[in-house]
C-alpha cells in the first residue's frame, strides 16, 4: 500500500493511535528533550544571562554613614567608589541649596568648602563599573550644633527710609578669619538694579555701597544667611535675616569751613543756607563726605570720651546728629553767643548750629535742620585745615574711590 504523508491509511480505524504511532511519539518527545538540553548547554557556553542584568561591580561609600549626627563641618564628608568611577554626586542642605564639590581621580568626591553647622544634608551618589553598570547610594546626616557663635549687627533697620548716602554696614560680634565664606552668605540688591560691592574694614566690619549715591526711591534689600557658617575656627553664625529699606529724597549739605556756612541742597535745589561754627585752631573739623548715622533730640557730650579730657561736659546738647565714630557731630549750640555762628570757628571739631537750650524752639536753625534730616543724609565738609575723614570712621564710605572700594585693598 502506498501511503502519502499526511493521508489516512485505507481501511484503518480512527478510534486511537496505533502502536507504531505511540512509539514514534515517544521517540519525538525524547528527541525534543535532548535538543532542549543541548540548547541550554550551548547557552551557558555562550555567556549565559544578559550582562546588563548582572549586579554592578562598582561600590559607593558615603562618609559619614547614613543617619550620622554631630558631623564636623570640615573634612568629614567624602564620597568614594571602588572598582568603578563616580558619575554623579549630589549634596543638598535642608533648604535645597546644593553643595559644590570636586571629583579626584574619578573615584573620590569632596566638597570644595566647609559645610554649615546644625544643618541636615542629603547625599545621592552613582558610580559605574567597566561594563557601565550603575551602583547608587543615598545617605543623610546632620552637622554639629556649635557652642561658640557670632551674628552681624546691621544698619539701616528693616522698613526704614534713609538718605542717599546710606551704606549697608554690618558689624560682627566676633572677628572673622574666613571673610570670603562669610560674605558669600550676605547679599545686597537694589531695585532699580545697580552694581553693589562689599568691602571689609578690619576683621569685624563689612560695608556695601553702589558706585554713586543711591537714587531717590530705590528699594534696597539685605539678605543674611549665616546659619552654620564657620566665621573663625570653631565659631559659627546663627543668623538668617531678610530686611529692606527705601531711599528717600536726596539731601546733601555742604559746610564751607572758611565761609562758616552750610548750604542745604535737596533734589538738586538749594533750599537753605545756615551760618555755622566749625572746629577751631588745633581741633579742626575733618574734611570729606560724612553720613548721618544717629539722631538724638538731646544727648550728653563729654570731652573725656573723645580724648579732650575735662575740657567740656555738656549734659543737654540739643538736636545732635552723629557724623563719625570718633565723635564728630552736627548739633545745636546754645552756649555760644548767636554772633559766633557765621563769624568764628570755635568748636572742638563738631559743626555747631544756633539753638536754644532744651531744643524746644522749632524756629532755630538747628531745630530746622534736625527736623529736615534723615539718617543717611550726606554732610560734606570742605576748606578745613584738617585731613579727609577715613571711610571707616563712621559710615563715611564715599571717601574712597569706586576702583579702590571694589579692589578690596
Residue ranges and their predicted role:
Residues 2-35, 39-249, 276:
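Acidic, low-complexity Ser/Thr/Gly/Pro-rich repeat segments typical of extracellular/periplasmic
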Residues 61, 78-80, 122, 169-171, ...:
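Soluble periplasmic/extracytoplasmic beta-strand elements of cell-envelope proteins
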Residues 127-129, 226-228, 268, 298, ...:
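Short, charged beta-turn/beta-strand-edge "cap" motif at the junction between a beta-strand
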Residues 155, 251-259, 399-409:
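Short peripheral tails and domain-boundary helices/loops at the edges of structured domains
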Residues 164, 303-409:
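Exported/periplasmic cell-wall-interacting domains
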Residues 234-342:
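Gly/Pro-biased beta-strand-loop elements
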